[in-house]
């Protein structure tokens, strides 16, 4: 029964229209506020700017020089664990701009189950 529930939830997310970016900002800001303390030292105590766009090919992006994280509006339709994964992933870019071993080690230290969370997004594409 649980498998059917998950399939139904996945179908509902796929059929749902992409939310408006402004409607997603409170959710993404709340997740960012929970993640920020782990990165406060790196960011000099200043929270990054969180922006939301209608992006089709990415879940998020990070612009360290601008102290800005941009998230896809469609991310709001994904499970909370997946949203948190993307936010942590983008925060990790403030420390490691690339996807080398240090980047993944930092992410794993914050979200040990990051691979399962990323899989939620890979299945949603």
Model-based region annotation:
Residues 1-85, 94-125:
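Active-site-proximal or metal-binding-adjacent scaffold patches in catalytic folds
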Residues 90:
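Walker B catalytic acidic pair
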């Amino acid at each position: 029964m649980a498998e059917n529930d998950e399939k139904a939830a996945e179908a509902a997310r796929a059929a749902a229209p992409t939310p408006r970016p402004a409607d997603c900002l409170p959710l993404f800001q709340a997740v960012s506020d929970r993640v920020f303390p782990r990165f406060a030292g790196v960011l000099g105590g200043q929270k990054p700017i969180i922006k939301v766009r209608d992006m089709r090919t990415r879940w998020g992006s990070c612009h360290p020089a601008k102290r800005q994280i941009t998230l896809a509006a469609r991310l709001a339709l994904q499970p909370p664990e997946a949203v948190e994964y993307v936010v942590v992933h983008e925060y990790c870019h403030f420390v490691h701009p690339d996807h080398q071993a240090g980047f993944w080690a930092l992410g794993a230290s914050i979200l040990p189950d990051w691979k399962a969370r990323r899989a939620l997004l890979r299945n949603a594409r």
